[in-house]
Curated annotation (Swiss-Prot):
Primary site of residence: cytoplasm
Tissues where this protein is expressed: Present in both white and brown adipose tissues with levels increasing during adipocyte differentiation. Lower levels observed in the testis.
Main function: Serine/threonine-protein kinase that plays a role in many biological processes such as fatty acid oxidation, autophagy, immune response or glucose metabolism. Phosphorylates 'Ser-794' of IRS1 in insulin-stimulated adipocytes, potentially modulating the efficiency of insulin signal transduction. Inhibits CREB activity by phosphorylating and repressing TORCs, the CREB-specific coactivators. Phosphorylates EP300 and thus inhibits its histone acetyltransferase activity. In turn, regulates the DNA-binding ability of several transcription factors such as PPARA or MLXIPL.
Modification N6-acetyllysine occurs at: K53
Protein name as catalogued: Serine/threonine-protein kinase SIK2
SMART domains from the UniProt entry: S_TKc (SM00220)
Record's catalysed reaction(s): L-seryl-[protein] + ATP = O-phospho-L-seryl-[protein] + ADP + H(+); L-threonyl-[protein] + ATP = O-phospho-L-threonyl-[protein] + ADP + H(+)
Gene designation: Sik2
Phenotype caused by lack of the gene: Constitutive knockout combined with conditional knockout of SIK3 in the haemopoietic cells results in a severe reduction in peripheral T-cells without reducing B-cell number.
Ranges of compositional bias, category Polar residues: 631-642, 758-768
Amino acid sequence: MVMADGPRHLQRGPVRVGFYDIEGTLGKGNFAVVKLGRHRTTKTEVAIKIIDKSQLDAVNLEKIYREVQIMKMLDHPHIIKLYQVMETKSMLYLVTEYAKNGEIFDYLANHGRLNESEARRKFWQILSAVDYCHGRKVVHRDLKAENLLLDNNMNIKIADFGFGNFFKTGELLATWCGSPPYAAPEVFEGQQYEGPQLDIWSMGVVLYVLVCGALPFDGPTLPILRQRVLEGRFRIPYFMSEDCEHLIRRMLVLDPSKRLSIAQIKEHKWMLIEVPVQRPILYPQEQENEPSIGEFNEQVLRLMHSLGIDQQKTVESLQNKSYNHFAAIYFLLVERLKSHRSSFPVEQRLDGRQRRPSTIAEQTVAKAQTVGLPVTLHPPNVRLMRSTLLPQASNVEAFSFPTSSCQAEAAFMEEECVDTPKVNGCLLDPVPPVLVRKGCQSLPSSMMETSIDEGLETEGEAEEDPSQAFEAFQATRSGQRRHTLSEVTNQLVVMPGAGKMFSMSDNPSLESVDSEYDMGSAQRDLNFLEDSPSLKDIMLANQPSPRMTSPFISLRPANPAMQALSSQKREAHNRSPVSFREGRRASDTSLTQGIVAFRQHLQNLARTKGILELNKVQLLYEQMGSNADPTLTSTAPQLQDLSSSCPQEEISQQQESVSSLSASMHPQLSPQQSLETQYLQHRLQKPNLLPKAQSPCPVYCKEPPRSLEQQLQEHRLQQKRLFLQKQSQLQAYFNQMQIAESSYPGPSQQLALPHQETPLTSQQPPSFSLTQALSPVLEPSSEQMQFSSFLSQYPEMQLQPLPSTPGPRAPPPLPSQLQQHQQPPPPPPPPPPQQPGAAPTSLQFSYQTCELPSTTSSVPNYPASCHYPVDGAQQSNLTGADCPRSSGLQDTASSYDPLALSELPGLFDCEMVEAVDPQHNGVVSCLARET
């Protein structure tokens, strides 16, 4: 895999490999290092993968050679091109195409997800490259965002065929390899598979990543990730169209035989929305049979001949696919002719489709004579035009090589083993052209390249152009850098006052080979254009319909303030929301309106590494056993607490720490977060619905419009919440008053009356306390309350004045708290027999009832079920069948009129209610009849 991370550190001269000057390091591995090099003849930047063969075993060495063999077979505009293979006794040098804009993984991490139109164009390029490989019986088996590179024009380049292999139709493969988040379920299960179906699954994951900016299958550990892949369940965000969802679901099918084929993907409705137009191939690719000399680019061959390179040896190298210095120079010159036409040594730049072979030869010979001039004619450009005449015997003596701990870098000492042919000159470095193109600067994601007829450009250049102010304005914002645009279109754009038409397109695959190269080193930093709107945004703003193509569109300088707002709007649009829901589309309800966008991108993830033997994941997990389980169980309570009390951003941060902890315990796994946080939050939504609703942390930016059905559901939820709150308050009140359900004996239980000879007054503590719990109907009260009107429905239940205390006394308060749906209490048990001479004591029953008296007396006789103790003076006034009664205050007693027998059933059918006495600031409870 070729990487383009970080700034390159220029090292002119000291380190060389063959014709290449090493300018920096792109990446390092265990047994290899990737260097950024520049060919001294063609001035083309390349990526050089230096492999230490002495550190590889036979299996890995065979894998390297197979990768080289596959790359030699492939020649596609969206596949990294192999230029040269150099091999010594212990080292192997692979010179490949250099993708300047790096991985699309990093692009998504920095810029967010792609819109579906742009993702479709990228996916068409990926699909064409994979179809090309499958047509040559080659399967990649490691398609992922890290292996999809972006060239100067933001076009896709597939890299890293390390897991690639050959396949035959109908034969199954049995090497279970790949990157876990992109691997198909049959790989995890250890089943034999067909290669193309494996790539189809990986392409489905890649398409999901392009559109959503996150992975469909993810997990903190490899076994969890494996389980989710085998389940085949993933979330669809609200911003994804139904056609795109249908395509992804048809690609991510667990049964390999039911997945879409490449031909079916090309015919899918979502893909047909925007189909790239195939332009004529200017430089036809080599056929399977041996090409003749006429099938090679004559212009490049003549130029090589002018540089002193034997044309016959070059043709033989190309026919034999030797990939030596001759072939490398030819490939690099062809590539420069395609991409850097502005700096290619041609006297008059004409459209390649209009040139004749004889014209090519004449122009090449004429220009080659000027290229071969001595370097001394151009003293200021000594560095650009320096001679590359390389004496093979004095290369090592001319330079001193720095020492390094990396054996791959130390292998540069073996330069004398790499034979280089004699070359008499070199080309100029690619420089921006003299003529200025009128264009609009834009983000790299929507870079476009103007393709203008060469004849239109020559007229009116000297006249005053009003659009120069627009050009100067854009130049100041980009640091005096001018950028051409990498996409060619069939739309015409007219610059104001210039009278020139620009042909532009939304499809990066239609890149014109006649467009000028003016990217330079500006594309190394993808963030310098963030505040400027794309040309496509301006075009769409002036069109009434997205599908409408207007032949004349005027462009004006944009306001910097509006550009900043446009940039913020675009960045907000590219962020994926956090509340995906499984099993349904989030856009089906209004709950997704105003969702706070999350800041979770691929930059928070560790890059996935391809591994072998993915089918042994479960076995490895069982062997780890106790090491993995505590990690998984320890995360659950932490996430439960976070989901109800912490903001979403803190949840994301803490879950990242949990994921990193898991990764430290399992270093061989690939800890990735992405949708893992969303997945865990979704799993916690159902059990924590009520705490989430009461959480002060806002989840939505604004109140969404509520439908009638939602309002009804919220009303029911509110009623249920109030019921639960009142029930909890009632239980707390019972516990406070020392009333427990276990203290009420059942109807079949009877309590004996023990003898109590000691006075009850000596047993009472200074403050009120009960040795036995009272029933909910009668409870002690510390204050005297007046008669309340709510008792008027019981006319016979009148209060009597207390004999020892002046003033009336209200009945003791009930403990209930406005309870709804309260069940009536069970009937009380019959009173136990009592000995006549025994002193009465407090009893314990379910509920206090009003018993009928045995005699018709004006003073009621209280049954033995009462358990209010009184003093000795009051006890003498009661018969032996009466029970002493206490209200919590000494020397006080209360008497009640008995209830009629016909009123008892109604009493038991009542429920408890409460009323507030405003005079005493107390709560009085009673039984209210149900209606």
